[in-house]
């Protein structure tokens, strides 16, 4: 408590910066000899004049905040709010971007293949790429990778609390269902398994989620209702690339309807998407069946709303990017992006560090169906260069036409946004292949990208410390510890007896919709087109 004399008055300032009188006060004007940064002129008041004293205290508090660079804002229903000039600038910028997004969302979703939006970089497109990238990152942040956990391979959070548990309280989306896949013999290094003898499932892994934007977000931020599908990929281990058979097979071999048997996809991706294990309650439906039934249900619910349009956005990183492309193709091929009244719902794919998925004919079929794909890549990342190291879209068109029947002739789909981590002053210029593949780093690169040859300048205030959440990518002088994200007590909690245990996590009602059989029967997936 600091005592400050002023003539016959003694005012005290406590640790909360409030001011109280501790002696009689006269009615003369006086100067309080604070240090320069605290100096104010005030009027001594009668100790019985509590309302006047309160007014002085409020004025002093207001002046203190103004000296700190805080500005007052009137908030409807919330009184006065104090914000820095930078806070107000960012708020106004966000408000303007949301207005623009409502007006231009079809272009941002790729209606014109993002013509004129990538160089220079459109700020709305950048914000949306970061936002959907964070939805893909949420799959990593929620996933239990720990083999010492009996819940290894699951989401650490329930469906209804998913975004709130991750601190994404302003996401504006609600998770409609979780996605699971069965362990695939072709990709053994992709799945995480517990070392416990008794586990939640021996063959399944949590793969992501389907979410839908809420009413307020749809109306005030997005300009439409959005169905978002996020696929989990791989955080650091890239051994799954070596597992790829580098073998293309027709999608029709896995009962995906397609009028052209020449449309082919890498066999490992295709099997992961369509395989199921009828003995496991989490994977008794394939990932494909889970996706298609949920999209069908949501389109039936929202597809013909009179007051809003509808979009479908699929996102994923790494192998999750491959599954995002494959599932978006399937949705369009099954014509699930059509409402009951025949309205066409745009389907957009946003991938980050994703591999090639299919052959040239697969790419052409995606274009025929109108599926828009944007691929964000780090030019130093090896994953987007696989599979199809030798025969791919970079070869002459004539050569690709000759070789397109070969089972190892691949082609990327859609538009590519190429970023370079060596342009960021925050990141180490030389790193290993898994670090160059890091999703948080790609979101950081997006935040600073303004166009080819433009200086790297962060634009949104997104914290660069997130890059080191699961990597050692930031330069040492920034003093951000590597791999800093960890769960409190590794998920252990105390029970009523005072013992430390792993909290019960799985609730079956979070996983499979009760009407999945109804929608499956209507889809008739086992019947040829």
From Swiss-Prot:
Where's the active site on this chain?
A: 318 (acyl-ester intermediate), 381 (charge relay system), 437 (charge relay system)
Q: Which UniProt keywords apply?
A: Chloroplast, Hydrolase, Lipid degradation, Lipid metabolism, Plastid, Transit peptide
Q: Under which EC number(s) is this enzyme classified?
A: 3.1.1.-
Q: In what tissue types does this protein appear?
A: Widely expressed. Highly expressed in leaves and stems.
Q: Which reactions is this enzyme annotated as catalysing?
A: 1,2-dihexadecanoyl-sn-glycero-3-phosphocholine + H2O = 2-hexadecanoyl-sn-glycero-3-phosphocholine + hexadecanoate + H(+); a 1,2-diacyl-3-O-(beta-D-galactosyl)-sn-glycerol + H2O = an acyl-3-O-(beta-D-galactosyl)-sn-glycerol + a fatty acid + H(+); a 1,2-diacyl-3-O-[alpha-D-galactosyl-(1->6)-beta-D-galactosyl]-sn-glycerol + H2O = acyl-3-O-[alpha-D-galactosyl-(1->6)-beta-D-galactosyl]-sn-glycerol + a fatty acid + H(+); a triacylglycerol + H2O = a diacylglycerol + a fatty acid + H(+)
What upregulates this protein? Slightly induced by wounding. Induced by wounding. Induced by cadmium and selenium in roots.
Gene Ontology BP terms: lipid catabolic process
Pfam families xrefs: Lipase_3 (PF01764)
Q: Where is this motif: GXSXG?
A: 316-320
Phenotypic effect of disruption: No visible phenotype under normal growth conditions.
Q: Which top EC class is given?
A: hydrolase
Domain of life of the source:
Eukaryota
Its GO CC terms are: chloroplast
State the InterPro entries in the record.
Answer: AB_hydrolase_fold (IPR029058), Fungal_lipase-type (IPR002921)
- Look up the transit peptide and give its residue range: 1-43
Q: Which GO terms describe its molecular function?
A: galactolipase activity; phospholipase A1 activity; triacylglycerol lipase activity
Q: Where is it located?
A: Plastid, Chloroplast
Q: What does this protein do?
A: Acylhydrolase with broad specificity. Catalyzes the hydrolysis of phosphatidylcholine at the sn-1 position. Possesses moderate activity toward phosphatidylcholine (PC), monogalactosyldiacylglycerol (MGDG), digalactosyldiacylglycerol (DGDG) and triacylglycerol (TAG).
Please describe the quaternary structure of this protein.
Answer: Interacts with SBP1.
Q: Which family does it belong to?
A: Belongs to the AB hydrolase superfamily. Lipase family.
* UniProt-recorded name of the protein: Phospholipase A1-Igamma2, chloroplastic
This protein's species is Arabidopsis thaliana (Mouse-ear cress)
